[in-house]
Amino acid sequence: MASISSLGAGSGMDLGSLLDKLQAAEKKRLEPLAQQQTSYKAKLTGFGTLKGSLEKLKSASEELKKFDKLNTTKTNGDHKTFTPSTDSKASPGNYEIEVQQLAKAQSLQSTEVSGVKKLLGEQGKGTRTIIITQPGEKEPMKISLKDDETSLVEIRDAINKKEGNVNASIIKADENGTEEEGKSYLILTSKKAGTRSIMTIKVEGDDELGKLLNYTSDGKGGGSGAMTQKVGAANAKLTVNGIPIERQTNEIKDAPEGIILNLKKVSETEEVIVKVNGEDKKIPRPKTEILVVSRDIEPMKEAIKKWVDSYNELQTTFDSLAKFKPVGKGEAASKDNGALLGDGTLKGIQSQLRHQLFAAQDVADIATLNKLGIKQKLDGTLEISDEKLEKNLKEKSADVKAFFMGDGAKPGSTQTYNLLKETLDGHEGTIATATEGINKRLKTLERQVEQTNRNIDATMERYKRQFTELDKLVNSLNNTSSSLFQLLR
């Protein structure tokens, strides 16, 4: 079969150009399909943009559900005797605090030992056991030692290996002492402070080692035995608004509730002059410190601002996707129209979201966004009234919580989060359903394009055959005509 470029060579007719025009006309059958593909792909992109904006609002709504974590408190300035912090249970208030005593961990010291590797137990005993008992521990520490494990080093390592409530260390008194000689001492220190960590030590199965380590506590901060108490166990003592408080540790977690006090030092005293029997006398008085706990509205305010910003971004996305640009009568639709103009899914999401946001909540004083301090502008976006919002956060935090989270019985406006979650569900959500339908339509269009191309190719092949035969026929007629003309001359 002749190529397109050679068509008409025999007849002198411009059949190649005619065939090109026929092919261009056939290709126009693809244009409606291509336009539909472009439109549906734009819709997919539009739904992707919409999903991104909805995800941001969903994330911001999820943060508002964590009201208790956001509804925080803060404390005033620096304090000499304690470092304060608060959790979600703290309530605003003023507290007068005096630190009377810091909690301390007990520390015991052995008698002098010559050399840290010298075996201190009776040989031939096989195994002996060091038992350390503390009132606050469920089980006593039991350290078993063999005959060759009774040096200070071995005892220290064996105790520390147990990882109980006791630390063991060695103090070398002689600067030039060796491991075999030189004054050394074993130090046992409770890891925890307070009187419930007072140690009682007993060595079973080795009287010689017992002469070095045995210690019996009297339960009152003292004791007797081979070891000497260098630091007595003590509980933390303080007063809060004049109420005496005693704890095992310097971290006071429940007085007042929701406030953590890390005690640093005992309160200083000052001399004040008072009248006693008509005479001025100087008496010592502790310098108390005032802890002021106030509500910290900034985290919640920031979360609300992020939520409003996310909503406004979504509103901008809605406007962009549904944009309509008028055209003259008979003109084609503008290319500037939104990708989801007239789309029912977009309208449905926008309508449901608006209903959720602006429906009145069952909260006495703060039933609407406007009463909360968030108003809707003419363009549909939201605007925060800082003064009104801050006043509500400071004075009506429970109502703000009920507005966003509900009161435990009735839902708050974070039901918007549930709507967004359903909308964005990857399997059955509104957007997933819409995009699934678009993808199915695109696959159908792809098959239609392939079939149309096959039909066009078949049609063009038929035209080529017909044009080739026509070229041959005209060429033959031309040759016959030329021969007859020569005969008739």
Curated annotation (Swiss-Prot):
Keywords: Bacterial flagellum, Coiled coil, Secreted. Disulfide bonds: none annotated. Transmembrane segments: none annotated. It is found in: Secreted; Bacterial flagellum. GO terms for cellular component: bacterial-type flagellum filament cap; bacterial-type flagellum hook; extracellular region. Residues 430-480 form a coiled coil. Residues 70-92 are annotated as: Disordered. Residues 70-81 have a biased composition (Basic and acidic residues). One of its GO terms (biological process) is cell adhesion. Residues 82-91 have a biased composition (Polar residues). PANTHER family: FLAGELLAR CAP/ASSEMBLY PROTEIN FLID (PTHR30288), FLAGELLAR HOOK-ASSOCIATED PROTEIN 2 (PTHR30288:SF0). Required for the morphogenesis and for the elongation of the flagellar filament by facilitating polymerization of the flagellin monomers at the tip of growing filament. Forms a capping structure, which prevents flagellin subunits (transported through the central channel of the flagellum) from leaking out without polymerization at the distal end. Belongs to the FliD family. Homopentamer. This is Flagellar hook-associated protein 2.
